[in-house]
Design a protein with these regions (language model features):
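Enzymes that bind and transform nitrogen-containing heteroaromatic metabolites
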Residues: 1-186
Length: 186
């Protein structure tokens, strides 16, 4: 059975984007990017909402040859090799390879996906992750805390959801980012 993993890069005060929608402060440096790539190798399916898909679809045509930073090349190859499911009621179609569009994020469908997937599944974006967390579908949370306080914006974790977490791993990076890996206790 595959794990459903929610990963997010957030500010120290818990936001994935500031109140203006900016998240440029969250771009990983080479060290963090290589670490993320190691985690992403186990992902076979990405689950995105519309907004996150619009950000991530860059990787479908990202350069994978010489001249690009090697961590970015590696991530592009990993992303291109994975399946993607986009949940949106406003999109009519998707343009990236290995991608399908669904209109509803159904609990039973995700449970079935977890039961049949041969590799782990990543849910990305705080809105879609909130649905998965609220319905008890997430097995692990991978949080990267950036050394910045933005004072408001889009929260990484939903309001009104109580989770009992068990710390599985932690790591500090040279740029001040801290990685925390938690198991979500049912």
């Amino acid at each position: 059975m595959a794990k459903l993993i929610y990963a997010a890069i957030s500010s120290l005060d818990g936001y994935v984007a500031d109140s203006d929608g900016n998240f440029d402060w969250s771009m990983p440096d080479e060290e963090v990017h290589r670490f993320v790539n190691g985690l992403e190798r186990d992902i076979g399916i990405y689950l995105y909402g519309r907004r996150m898909y619009e950000v991530m679809r860059y990787w479908d045509t990202a350069p994978t040859g010489n001249g690009e930073p090697s961590a970015e090349q590696e991530f592009a190859k990993t992303w291109q090799a994975a399946d993607k499911i986009i949940y949106s009621r406003t999109l009519d179609s998707v343009s990236t390879a290995r991608t399908r569009l669904e209109h509803d994020f159904g609990v039973q469908a995700i449970q079935q996906l977890k039961a049949t997937a041969t590799r782990d599944i990543a849910v990305s974006g705080p809105t879609l992750a909130a649905q998965a967390l609220s319905n008890g579908l997430v097995d692990e949370c991978h949080l990267f805390l950036s050394p910045i306080v933005v004072g408001g914006g889009t929260a990484a974790l939903p309001d009104n959801v109580r989770l009992q977490l068990e710390l599985l791993d932690e790591r500090r990076f040279g740029n001040g980012v801290v990685y925390l890996r938690y198991h979500v206790n049912g």
